[in-house]
From Swiss-Prot:
Origin species: Drosophila melanogaster (Fruit fly)
Active site residues per record: 32 (nucleophile), 35 (nucleophile)
Annotated Gene Ontology cellular component terms: cytosol; nucleus
Protein name: Thioredoxin-2
GO molecular function: disulfide oxidoreductase activity; glutathione disulfide oxidoreductase activity; protein-disulfide reductase activity
């Protein structure tokens, strides 16, 4: 499942609901070409690993406060959280790395 976060309170609620699962925060922008390219792979992976992974998309233009909190400077940036703790982060539309990091952390 891929869910687009509306604001900080929404993100906090989603993180609480995802307790025990790997959370992938996808920081993106609607105008970002690489973000659009990686999006179908992210949907595919969220379906493939639905029992263990929650994908939360964060539009950096709509949720600037969240992007600032996570020090996001380029898109897409993926932040991986487990039980509220960051376990990995990388920037760029690298589908292989995205899949590898998910598999390594579920």
């Amino acid at each position: 499942m891929v869910y687009q976060v509306k604001d900080k309170a929404d993100l906090d609620g989603q993180l609480t609901k995802a307790s025990g699962k790997l959370v992938v925060l996808d920081f993106f922008a609607t105008w970002c070409g690489p973000c659009k390219m990686i999006s179908p792979k992210l949907v595919e992976l969220s379906t493939q690993f639905a029992d263990n992974v929650v994908v939360l998309k964060v539009d950096v233009d709509e949720c600037e406060d969240i992007a600032m909190e996570y020090n996001i400077s380029s898109m897409p940036t993926f932040v991986f959280l487990k039980n509220g703790v960051k376990v990995e982060e990388f920037a760029g539309a690298n589908a292989k790395r995205l899949e590898d990091v998910i598999k390594a952390n579920i």
